[in-house]
Curated annotation (Swiss-Prot):
Designated name of the protein: Large ribosomal subunit protein bL21
Keywords assigned: Ribonucleoprotein, Ribosomal protein, RNA-binding, rRNA-binding
NCBIfam families: L21
Record function comment: This protein binds to 23S rRNA in the presence of protein L20.
Lineage, top ranks: Bacteria, Pseudomonadati, Thermodesulfobacteriota, Desulfuromonadia, Geobacterales
Subunit annotation: Part of the 50S ribosomal subunit. Contacts protein L20.
Length: 102
């Protein structure tokens, strides 16, 4: 059984036991989160919401709070010898999907 959930303005396809990396959520490691925005549930029978599946939820546990690898942002202006190099590390949360209920 799998589900499509919406969090952080993005949609993710998840199944029980999966690990999912999403935008940072304000929870500590070990917390349980319930996602009510379930767009679709698949498996033997497919349920597609309009826009959400009524009564469906996905339960996940916070596994890791961390940061991504550094990306480098380089800005320059032509013919001016003006250059700027900036590094950025985005915060993320890793979730373990525990239960999909419809």
């Amino acid at each position: 059984m799998y589900a499509v959930i919406k969090t952080g303005g993005k949609q993710y396809k998840v199944a029980e036991g999966d690990f999912l990396k999403v935008e940072k959520l304000d929870n500590i490691v070990g917390d349980t989160i319930e996602f009510g925005e379930v767009l679709m549930i698949g498996g033997d029978a497919v349920k597609v919401g309009a826009p959400l599946v009524a009564g469906a939820s996905v339960t996940a546990k916070v596994a890791v709070q961390g940061r991504d690898k550094k990306i480098l942002v380089f800005k320059s202006k032509r013919r001016k010898n003006s250059r700027k190099l900036i590094g950025h590390r985005q915060y993320h949360t890793v979730l373990k999907i525990e239960k999909i209920s419809a």
